[in-house]
């Protein structure tokens, strides 16, 4: 080969090498991804602040013997860009990993991780995603709950599953998944990490709330419904006729009578045969056809209660007593959703209810263990199984309303699957002074503050199950008695002021007079009309357990809403600072005209332009609408 040929060959090689190395970019108005396939370097940039996050490596695997397989131990086999998506394939003799980078909804981003074994099942103790070091100033996890969002400079980082552990310490951050089952060649495990940004510290909660509503399967929308619990059923079966009678009563007094749409009649515990197979009981031998048709005739639908772990008290014991007969797995005296046999049946039955009975909402009550692994299960825990179940349910009917109760926690990641979760604590209880209704309200809100506001400050209050409005014949602690009009109005308006979209009515119709029906109708209509504001609802004020004044605030540019309550039997002063209460962004109006929606208080100015001290009377509940002053 002469010198000229050699030079040409070298040049061709360099061109070829350069052709195989490239830098890829994805971007939208909020975030930009950059990936260099030669250096394997990945970075994400906040378009607004310029802050940059670049992980030490995109991922790494830790084996049971603590050996670590780094991303550098993999070979990149493919990089494919299509629209707003970039896929990167990583190959290793024992594992394959695919990264899927996406920019979402105009200002967010995500990285999907899919991990599979090669050749045979492989043990992996832990998968670590997006590990950073020294990339941000004092990053932290905002919340005490596993999988709470990581906050790093102007970024918030969230996993798609509540079983993922988020970690931040001394300028390092990562997301970890501990695996209890081998990774399979044909059944990869998948996780997604979401990224969003916030323009200023005061807007972190609102930015997270907006992000969740943008990507959740069913955007925020009030779901107002009757629930049979403590009314026609309370650990007891009920009949088709019981349900039809209630439908007639609600139609007469509320739906047709006062022009309020009821989204559903939810049938709580009492409809199944208690065999543990989730089959219809004798009272519904023909399924829900009759009640479904009746509901449709009044522009409503049917919702349904099921309990993955089997329910509560004697009905649960009766269901679980059949576990051995049908080969269903149990843990601690309850069904285990992650058990192969039980999951197969539960999943099959719930899909049948969706497809054949046209159920529009589910109250899944009791999600089971988070730490126990069932032998031969494909799932690490019942939490893992519940995520798979909900995915299947959504695939069958995307617009389902899914409420998860006991067994969940204040991880915002639940809202990538469910529409609401439990506020924690007891169904109903009493705390503090006052009538049973006032004590119930204080307990409800004290539990919310203790378990949600403090432990999961970025969890949207608009997606909590508060246990609704209670005035039912089989309730307890005094809530089974007819309430005064004032107490019922306080309970009703304070409930709708929470902004929750799960609007449960545990009400026996005969316990409401015309005044109460009017209150309920007015508040429900107000909630639906103001949903675009109430979606932003967040906590204001103090701790109900300490009997401090507290409440709820929500804001949008055109309008804001404030609800306050004094849980004490003594008058209390409250420092009213609407800029702080509404979490108003920089540059927006801070002077308002206040319009009373519920209650009246002479110490509250009709025109607000500066912080002021107001006084709430004992047990006073107040709700205002605030519009920017002209």
Feature roles, as predicted:
Residues 8-16:
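Bacterial N-terminal signal peptides
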Residues 227-244, 271-285, 328-345, 368-383:
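The substrate-binding groove and active-site-proximal loops of carbohydrate-active enzymes
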Residues 259-271, 345-376:
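Active-site groove signature of glycoside hydrolases
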